[in-house]
């Protein structure tokens, strides 16, 4: 399969730079996986698409202010993007500089350069940085960090993004990108879903900056997926197995929830799914056998991205590309602050040939 098979033309005017005034007021394109039928509506229509007893699985990661600006003590400007927090004093990060710092280099971070840190080691493209400060990494980031808006939202971060670029149920700090399908859920909608009898469970996957890295190979099978930490606790496993047993659907909110659930299913030894607390490099593309997820809430993804490949594996390649073509024609808003899709699983997708 070629990466270019997942390309599509997207006018720049359709990239959303700000969210809708109300979280749940965005548009919703529904794709029936088995038939490819499309329905246009608004996000609150989700209430009518879910049945009592269906299980919504959310990702409760919280975005940290992961972008830091400063300079090397030797003079050159740097930009630091946290990939993950290693402990209370150390981070693993991407560093942009005219010349990469060497181990032992002193870094002065923050708008006033008041935070002192040391680059202690290099791991491939990533740098290990230790803060020389009494405060925890999280306290330092909250004090001097900027929200790491995706590169296609071409504007500086604003104070409002600290709230807008978080889900209302975010709980566990550690992500450098929001699980954006969840941004559309507000408390009134969540209350209505609960009142209808829709069940809810929460996994944690700390989205890394690697999620924005382009696929740099021509053939999909040659791509090496970035690693992210995921948690699927026992209560989620119990909720999934109970939903399946009573004939209800498991609906993943976002591709990160999909990757968490399917990672736990892949690693399971004795059951459909078992608790999972580990790094995952799961790469889902056409031909992948889904085991857990029956329906998916997701945003519109970048051309040639691993995420549009994941959706194609779920709904079928042709159905997915047709849906994206319709979304462009109907002027849906794309990417992190854009509109959403509701997709049901296409069991025939695994047999579809792509690019032939």
UniProtKB/Swiss-Prot annotation:
Record EC number: 2.4.99.17
Main subcellular location of this protein, as a coarse class: cytoplasm
Pfam families cross-referenced by the UniProt entry: Queuosine_synth
Catalyzed chemical reaction(s): 7-aminomethyl-7-carbaguanosine(34) in tRNA + S-adenosyl-L-methionine = epoxyqueuosine(34) in tRNA + adenine + L-methionine + 2 H(+)
Known pathway: tRNA modification; tRNA-queuosine biosynthesis
Gene Ontology MF terms in the entry: S-adenosylmethionine:tRNA ribosyltransferase-isomerase activity
GO biological process: one example: tRNA wobble guanine modification
Localization: Cytoplasm
UniProt KW Zinc keyword: no
Self-association and partners: Monomer.
Family in the record: Belongs to the QueA family.
Protein name: S-adenosylmethionine:tRNA ribosyltransferase-isomerase
Organism from which the protein derives: Escherichia coli (strain 55989 / EAEC)
Gene: queA
